[in-house]
Amino acid sequence: MPNTDTKTPLRTGSLRSFIRWLVISVVLLWSLAALILLAARWIDPPTTAVHIQRRLQAWIHHTPYRERYKFIPLGQISADLQHAVIAAEDARFYQHHGFDWHEVQIAAEEDLEGERTRGASTITQQLVKNLFFGTGRSFLRKGAEASLVPVAEFVLGKQRILEIYLNVVEWGPGIYGAESACRYYDEAAARNIGRQQAARLAAILPAPLKRRPERMNNYSAIILKRMGQMGW
């Protein structure tokens, strides 16, 4: 009969070592992400997880890919475009601290009723996802994202969060940021975009690889109405 007394401690020790290694790895990765967010307070991100993901997808599938990405100060993005994106993506952006629990509750109720019409992610959550996690979805990623959202709110502040988001968000195939989107779709600088153009651009953000501004008249009208209701 084999002696299992010596095997059990070995297995227990190996499991403990693995768990310890796993915890240390998670803590180190989280700390690195937090440091990147802190650095982003002063340094404009040169790239994001979404940018890298799209490059890899193009390389794997041997498809042509041209990246348009130019980071500009928030002051060079028209107020109309800033307001349109907030109205479309996160109406309570300036009221919450990273999570909009009101929207979470509505989304949960719609899920239960099978009538989901909108997401509950805030601009801060979307920024964290863009910077670190790409477009994939999983409970593990959601948990990691949620742990970094308060850090982003604390170290960056609302205006810097909005500035980075508007500059890195995907606005079409290979098109990142407000300046690139405005130049591509409207042949204009981001500072010169008016209300109608801004609403159409904001309307494509939920599905930037499928939508085009010229086809977003109905949704852009809703965004314009929201802007008016918000005093913009």
Segments from the language model and where they lie:
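Juxtamembrane regions of bacterial inner-membrane/periplasmic proteins
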Residues: 2-232
